[in-house]
Amino acid sequence: MNISQKGIDFIKKWEGGPWLTAKRFGTEKYLSIGYGHYGPDVKMGMKITKSQAEDLLRKDIAGAVKHVNNINDKYHYDFNQNEFDSLTSFAYNIGSINQLTANGTRSKSVIADKMLLYNKSCGKVLPGLTNRRKAERELFLSKSGSGSKGETFTMEMKVITQGMTCGQV
């Protein structure tokens, strides 16, 4: 399975940006650029185009997509597209979904509820992470595609706070 364009747009909204010039958020060790690209390869003064930001995001998302597919295949969850997109967003932001699935022992409804627990940075609840986790949970629980009467299910998101790290509120 792969992330949908809706899933990519979801991640872009929550990551903020695109930051076309490298910047540091709070007390983070490394700089960020684009849509949440973070690491030692991002240097002070570095600049990219919007197209390069999109390319970086797609490359970065690939690791999260692979991780979610591995969990899906290993534990036979049979995630639908919205569940997959939601979990890919979570994995992109946190790095893993292992803590949600508990090695395949949790049901999908428990996984959705556990998402809400990951709203802290440095032990402090952050409104931006709380809102992102609520949106990921809502996407996870929403029907994928068309309903029985042909209606299309969509989700609106409110981006309250983005890019918050330790020391920022």
What are these regions (language model features)?
Residues 32-34, 86-91, 113-114:
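Structural recognition of the beta-strand scaffold that forms the well-ordered cores
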Residues 1-24, 28, 37, 42-44, ...:
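Long, amphipathic alpha-helical surface segments
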Residues 59-98:
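Active-site nucleophile-His-acid catalytic modules used for acyl/amide transfer and hydrolysis
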